[in-house]
């Protein structure tokens, strides 16, 4: 098979399965409204959970940062790209989340890949939740360490896997709030089992940080656990982009020596770090509390109105509210019908989610109003 034949076969297989991904160029994709092809839609696909991507204070912080530092960092943090803005953000994140250190990365994907690649050796073992994010599972599969997956949120299964002999160290990997299902991991139980087997715990809290817990400190704070490795990302609750790894002093020093994604990548622009500092300030403030309270009220309103629809609806209260449809084609058709009626909703299909669980992944944000939720419910009832 030639290169072209290989590529054509892979694309054809996705088309036949109604699983071919497509991008849509938008004029505005975050916040309450999505604008595409000169049309305006209520946006129920954004991860901008607190509606901070258009916050004037954060925008101005980025502008002032660009005026002060320029538009790029100029290099890796190990060369010339680690600015006082980066240092200040790391210190503020560490203080906020109760860790000794924080290290910045250009994305959550890069952070997860870097940590697992740097920490794991062939004699070690990775034990990951089966529904962990693609960045975690890909990093684990590329690692020299064996990967074992435990059934989703099944602590008993996790304990059995950890109990089997391992010549090296064991790293348990999970998420705080799962990106496609919107449910939370039982972190306290997972940490207890992990500690019983002398393992370390790594939690990716991309969808919890900023959104839940006191001052938006996320899933681990809410469940009163402190994993050895906590990954937080800035493209969701913070409304910006990038990520950080929270850890001890010695682990941070280790990652600075061995995390290749950190060493050999240009660091995020200092102006972005300034915007993130402003975003963190909002998240920790009374305004942040108000936005989280509003989001919770919107979620309650949505769940009360969707109970009688013929979709599988999980019992969860996160900003991610998936409606399980099952069939790929039907999920695509429903998403298109909703768009035709002014609601931008994304159909998520395998391989992103397990076969037979195609869904409408609805996300609610603090930028929405109650009438937006009522309109979404009206459209869903008309197409259920």
Swiss-Prot record:
Any matching Pfam family: Aminotran_1_2
- Report the EC code(s) recorded for this entry: 2.3.1.47
**InterPro entries recorded:** Aminotrans_II_pyridoxalP_BS (IPR001917), Aminotransferase_I/II_large (IPR004839), AON_synthase_class-II (IPR050087), AONS_Archaea/Proteobacteria (IPR004723), AONS_Proteobacteria (IPR022834), PyrdxlP-dep_Trfase (IPR015424), PyrdxlP-dep_Trfase_major (IPR015421), PyrdxlP-dep_Trfase_small (IPR015422)
Keyword Nucleotide-binding on this protein? no
Q: Name one GO biological process term.
A: biotin biosynthetic process
Gene3D superfamilies assigned: Aspartate Aminotransferase, domain 1 (3.90.1150.10), Type I PLP-dependent aspartate aminotransferase-like (Major domain) (3.40.640.10)
Q: Which reaction does it catalyse?
A: 6-carboxyhexanoyl-[ACP] + L-alanine + H(+) = (8S)-8-amino-7-oxononanoate + holo-[ACP] + CO2
Name the Gene Ontology molecular function terms of this record: 8-amino-7-oxononanoate synthase activity; pyridoxal phosphate binding
Q: Where does substrate bind?
A: 21, 133, 352
If you read the UniProt record, what top EC class would you report for this enzyme, in one word?
transferase
Transferase among the record's keywords? yes
Binding sites annotated in the UniProt record for pyridoxal 5'-phosphate? 108-109, 179, 207, 233
Pathway note: Cofactor biosynthesis; biotin biosynthesis
N6-(pyridoxal phosphate)lysine PTM sites in chain numbering: 236
Q: How does it assemble?
A: Homodimer.
The family assignment reads:
Belongs to the class-II pyridoxal-phosphate-dependent aminotransferase family. BioF subfamily.
What is the name of this protein? 8-amino-7-oxononanoate synthase
Organism in which the protein naturally occurs: Escherichia coli O127:H6 (strain E2348/69 / EPEC)
For this protein's source organism, the top of the classification is: Bacteria, Pseudomonadati, Pseudomonadota, Gammaproteobacteria, Enterobacterales
Query: Gene encoding this polypeptide?
Result: bioF
């Amino acid at each position: 098979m030639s290169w072209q034949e290989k590529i054509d076969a892979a694309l054809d297989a996705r088309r036949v399965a109604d699983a071919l991904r497509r991008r849509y160029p938008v004029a505005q994709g975050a916040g309450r409204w999505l604008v595409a092809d000169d049309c305006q839609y209520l946006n129920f696909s954004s991860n901008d959970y607190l509606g901070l991507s258009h916050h004037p204070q954060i925008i101005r912080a980025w502008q002032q940062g660009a005026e002060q530092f320029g538009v790029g960092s100029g290099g890796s943090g190990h060369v010339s790209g680690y600015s006082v803005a980066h240092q200040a953000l790391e210190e503020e994140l560490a203080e906020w989340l109760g860790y000794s250190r924080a290290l910045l990365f250009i994305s959550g994907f890069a952070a997860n890949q870097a940590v697992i690649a740097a920490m794991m050796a062939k004699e070690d073992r990775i034990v990951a939740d089966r529904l962990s994010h693609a960045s975690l599972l890909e990093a684990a599969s590329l690692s020299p360490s064996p990967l074992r997956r435990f059934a989703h949120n099944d602590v008993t299964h996790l304990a059995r896997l950890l109990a089997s002999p391992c010549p090296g160290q064991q790293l348990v990997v999970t998420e705080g709030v799962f990106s496609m299902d919107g449910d939370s991991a039982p972190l306290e139980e997972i940490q207890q089992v992990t500690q019983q087997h002398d393992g370390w715990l790594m939690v990716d809290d991309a969808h919890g940080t900023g959104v839940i817990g006191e001052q938006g400190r996320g899933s681990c704070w809410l469940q009163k656990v402190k994993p050895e490795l906590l990954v937080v990302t800035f493209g969701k609750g913070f409304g910006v982009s990038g990520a950080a790894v929270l850890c001890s002093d010695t682990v941070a020093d280790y990652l600075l020596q061995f995390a290749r994604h950190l060493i050999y990548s240009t660091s995020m622009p200092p102006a972005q770090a300034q915007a993130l500092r402003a975003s963190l300030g909002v998240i920790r403030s009374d305004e942040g509390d108000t936005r989280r309270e509003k989001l919770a009220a919107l979620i309650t309103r949505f769940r009360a109105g969707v109970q009688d629809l013929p979709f599988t609806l999980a019992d969860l209260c996160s900003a991610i509210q998936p409606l399980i449809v099952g069939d790929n084609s039907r999920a695509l058709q429903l998403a298109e019908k909703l768009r035709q009626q002014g609601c931008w909703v994304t159909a998520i299909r395998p391989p992103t989610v397990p076969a037979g669980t195609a869904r409408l992944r609805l996300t609610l944000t603090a930028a929405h109003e109650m009438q937006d939720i009522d309109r979404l419910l009206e459209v869903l009832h008309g197409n259920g």
